[in-house]
Amino acid sequence: MKIIKISPRGYCYGVVDAMVIARNAALDKSLPRPIYILGMIVHNKHVTDAFEEDGIITLDGPSRLEILDQIDSGTVIFTAHGVSPEVKQRAKEKGLTTIDATCPDVTKTHDLIEAKKSEGYHVIYIGKKGHPEPEGAVGIAPDIVHLIEKADDLKTLEIPTDKILVTNQTTMSQWDVQHLMEDIKKKFPTAEFHKEICLATQVRQEAVAKQADVADLTIVVGDPKSNNSNRLAQVSQEIAGTKAYRVADVSEIQLEWLQGVEAVAVTAGASTPTPITKEVIAFLEQYDPTNPATWERKRNVPLQKILPRVKVKKQ
């Protein structure tokens, strides 16, 4: 069986930066304890489990404000997905020490919304409902930001001005965003468009579109909560025309997927640890459908191999 290692794949700079910030926080003895992450620092359970070993507590919930209500003291890390000004203000009022690990690409979108609000615009924001990134973006100016996920959401959308900005969640499918923007243009012809798909998301999606088309199957390594991982599977199926499955790690691979497969493409979401992806590739490289000894799918990557190394500062 031929293995096509799609490149680029895996970690983006925003994810690595967020994890380094959190690791440095764990090593900083001057920070008030306990240290919490407000939601998953990045959408990967292997990463949050590894941080738990570092003594950092991940709290998750339906909204950042509701999670914050669980915290009375200590240090709070804001995740790569960004948070609203209301969350930052509430943390300040509670006397919490805060560390901001927001991805710079997300901050760029927040700044754009702020600027357009001051100019009297309304904003149509294309994003996935229930995902923390749109929650933070809408929270920048909830009175003028309108979240839409699908074309159907446009049917009931009314905006009381011709000054309209259209932007989006950074990890959406670029093709979905483009189609929605075309629909928006028909309904709101005066709208201005700022496509904010981050470069890492864009090049990973384009790599799948161009490289997975010669495979019989694509395996995307990524957490079920990772929007960019789920979008990679979508791109494989809808753009490359190759059936795709998303797995959190090697243990989730089903042998029946591999029946009759001569070429399998492998990629990984931007929040997927490299050792987890390497383990999937190693399994596929040694897999022999006629030899049961090669069929075991067990995750063996130790948690201490998940997080990036950081230099310990001398006291």
Curated annotation (Swiss-Prot):
Isopentenyl diphosphate binds at residues 43, 81, 131, 226, 228, 271. Dimethylallyl diphosphate binds at residues 43, 81, 131, 226, 228, 271. Its cofactor is [4Fe-4S] cluster. It catalyses: isopentenyl diphosphate + 2 oxidized [2Fe-2S]-[ferredoxin] + H2O = (2E)-4-hydroxy-3-methylbut-2-enyl diphosphate + 2 reduced [2Fe-2S]-[ferredoxin] + 2 H(+); dimethylallyl diphosphate + 2 oxidized [2Fe-2S]-[ferredoxin] + H2O = (2E)-4-hydroxy-3-methylbut-2-enyl diphosphate + 2 reduced [2Fe-2S]-[ferredoxin] + 2 H(+). Catalyzes the conversion of 1-hydroxy-2-methyl-2-(E)-butenyl 4-diphosphate (HMBPP) into a mixture of isopentenyl diphosphate (IPP) and dimethylallyl diphosphate (DMAPP). Acts in the terminal step of the DOXP/MEP pathway for isoprenoid precursor biosynthesis. (2E)-4-hydroxy-3-methylbut-2-enyl diphosphate binds at residues 43, 81, 131, 170, 226, 228, 271. Binds 1 [4Fe-4S] cluster per subunit. The gene is ispH. This is 4-hydroxy-3-methylbut-2-enyl diphosphate reductase. InterPro entries: LytB/IspH (IPR003451). It is an enzyme of class 1 (oxidoreductase). GO terms for molecular function: 4 iron, 4 sulfur cluster binding; 4-hydroxy-3-methylbut-2-enyl diphosphate reductase activity; metal ion binding. One of its GO terms (biological process) is terpenoid biosynthetic process. [4Fe-4S] cluster binds at residues 12, 103, 198. Its EC number is 1.17.7.4. Pathway: Isoprenoid biosynthesis; dimethylallyl diphosphate biosynthesis; dimethylallyl diphosphate from (2E)-4-hydroxy-3-methylbutenyl diphosphate: step 1/1; Isoprenoid biosynthesis; isopentenyl diphosphate biosynthesis via DXP pathway; isopentenyl diphosphate from 1-deoxy-D-xylulose 5-phosphate: step 6/6. Keywords: 4Fe-4S, Iron, Iron-sulfur, Isoprene biosynthesis, Metal-binding, Oxidoreductase. The keyword Cell wall biogenesis/degradation does not apply. HAMAP family: IspH (MF_00191). It comes from Bacillus cytotoxicus (strain DSM 22905 / CIP 110041 / 391-98 / NVH 391-98). Belongs to the IspH family. The active site is at residue 133.
